[in-house]
């Protein structure tokens, strides 16, 4: 292949590294209204009264809005295809606040100074209620977080709001209890993953204006422009035809911007006042009043024979949703359906779950989307089982891992067409010289341990999410590709252009990618669920096939021959007998200038009936100081099966970035709350992200498979890369120090205390 598989430089690379004005705040007019939010200091309270009279008299203030001024429809902020699984459990503003940071009032003014003064001048009388902060005690608690009568769910999600249950359910294959009774070895363990912040560089932000036609235009740093349009329509109670959402470049998202946290506030202000307005969340607001990864507790039972054949796995997961239900019913599913299928040969498996409300900040989407948490539990208990049986952790995986052409009973009964998981493990072992290293090595002042983990994810949401594109042959013979997908740093603008170049036999530089707005871009559900390469990529392939056919038909008409007598090699068009020949540039000019009088445009959409999983293996080599318990990741190798790699350079940095995020989740990142429900970690001094000195040698390689349903055999890569570090590092520490830490993050204190307890 000429373009696919090549390390093409990102099309927007120079603009981004030279600081060109491409982000949301760069594009907002300097004289637009500044919007800020008064937030609740209480985790749970009812608003008895709000006095905004003084605030409204401050010079420069345009408006102050409370719950009495906004529409009363309930909606969800989750960026999901309609009908959304997330419950409709919120309003723009309400007379009940459900976490510290919940919105109480909207203030719009000419500048930040007057808006800040107005926020301080608002007087709120609260009836403070006892908050529910412990998600283990949420179900059937006397404290009910959502008591409203107009709460509703569009889908059957096992919801019981009066019991604080957002969602519940189970997936059962075989008789787990009976099989466990027959097993030689049964382990039963509890694991706990904490909430994590996505910590993208660009905070939440948007600005809005009214155009010449009286329509609301929302410019937003979002992964989900088409979903934002629907959310604004629901929240403002206006038709979608009155709304256009524009997506500029995004300074990172990692799932956080799959929830429309801030757009409703500027949209409401602009719609009411008919003036442009913008909101830019502070870093503290983005930490404490947007969304995070779901905190989960997992109870796992596993049974096996003496020789290491796994017979049954039983996984129960409890998920802390926080105050509002965005993404709760869907993240939880991945905790089981993206972990249990890794070991598909079991006689029985069971996945049960509950998602519960608490008076903490809502959880949402974060790279991995529930699979990260579930795989920490399942991969950790696999490692513990190997230790219990005195088996090598790689050996037990080779013995039990899923293989190509199997039907995955806990993965919606999908057939596994492309799987190189076994080859990934073999290559990772070679990369780290695994066979020549013991699991534990005494290095003097520190001990070095090895740990292994497997991972899988999906490629889009099968049977639901859609990617669409439009491609045009322009005069002079170049192509414009219009997409609805959002490039949030992943390089999809470049990757999709590579696919066009491959299909049309041209250079990538001949393809101009346009990522437009909801008025002009073809419909795309958004950049999430690892969907863009796989789903939108297939739309590109289908549209290019149509365009090639249109070129052949137009040329046949122009040369007055049959279409079958035309050849097109990407650069020129000729008849088979070479009696007629024309360069593509001249042919395109002829199309535009009346010789053919036909614009050559093709569009297509794709929705996949399957979601083929990519796979990954990670092996961690970790050093632990004997005296202090200090943990350092010495080396980390990973091998990814994402089908055909479209752009190795971009795929590699995707993997490296995900691994670093996983290392942070394993060792340092932890959102905690005070007894009053206030988040403690609200800036980068308190929330400990891994820095460059914390990041080891991270080595990434690829092991190809070929997915028949993907573009050029490709699968996804965006999310699978974050999942392996937690369990691999935990196992490496266990081998080094003899301490199995089952609650993340793994700190020196936990290791030393665990050693004392041992």
Features from the language model and the residues they span:
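Flexible, low-hydrophobicity surface segments
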Residues: 1-160, 186, 272, 600
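Glycine-rich loop/linker segments at domain edges
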Residues: 6, 12-15, 82-83, 87, ...
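C-terminal catalytic domains of large/alpha subunits in multi-subunit enzymes
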Residues: 67-68, 237-242, 272-277, 306, ...
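Short acidic, glycine/serine/threonine-rich loops at helix termini
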Residues: 74-79, 118-121, 229-231, 254-260, ...
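Conserved catalytic cysteine-centered active-site region
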Residues: 95-96, 239-242, 246-247, 271-282, ...
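Thiamine diphosphate
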Residues: 230, 251-274, 278-279, 492-500
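Helix-loop-helix junctions that connect adjacent transmembrane helices in secondary transporters/permeases
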Residues: 145-236, 401-478, 680-701
